[in-house]
Amino acid sequence: LADEYGLWIIEDACHAPGGYFMDSKGKKQHCGNGCFADCAVFSFHPVKHIATGEGGMVTTNSKELYDRLCLYRTHGITKDPALLHEHHGGWYYEMQELGYNYRLTDFQAALGISQLERAKAGLERRHEIVRRYNEAFSGIDGIKTPFNTADVYHAYHLYIIQVADRLGLYNYLHENNVYAQVHYAPLHLMPYYQQWGNRKGDLPIVEEYYEHCLSLPMYPTLTDEEQEYVIEKVIEFVAK
């Protein structure tokens, strides 16, 4: 469809570093490797797998797209001789696009690179936390755990359960110093998008999911004792 209609495919891999899936030929495909998308985007926000304070990354297998992204990153400016329209000396540069300042500082880049050394261990710890959550909530009426399949290695940026009384559980957990969160409010319900005609009821399945989803604490430094406390409080509320 993308080829037929001249569309770009952008893979949102912000929650997926280290994740992979098996394609139809049984080949492992890592998220963001460009196997089906023109480019992929990653986030380096403080709560993501790799953090640089703020920022992100775009990956692509296209040299043409790479050159354009480099322009957008630095105010639309280039000094690459191969891309210049004119040549006036080594100092010369051109503004060829309406770009912005999306440059990551060297300090932030160094911080991100240093975290690559523990990225695998962090991902393994996330899987251990998920296993413990799943085992604890297995068979408990009123708690729906995340769905996954054998051909996918999930990055588990979040651990999201679904419950009937999401607001009640959210409040109960916060009262007991468990900082659960909701991910995410549907975009079509936001005021900005509603001005373009989007309305509640347009996406009923999305809205149904939103009414019941709740993210539990999920980060590599979460201790077993802390997780047991979270589990205890969730089960306490659901059992009421």
State where each predicted segment sits.
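Glycosyltransferases and closely related glycan-assembly transferases
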Residues: 1-5
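Residue-level detector of structured alpha->beta connecting loops
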Residues: 6, 36-38, 141
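PLP-dependent aminotransferase class I/II
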Residues: 8, 16, 20, 24, ...
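Conserved active-site segment immediately N-terminal to the catalytic lysine
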Residues: 11-51, 91-96
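Active-site PLP attachment segment
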Residues: 35-79
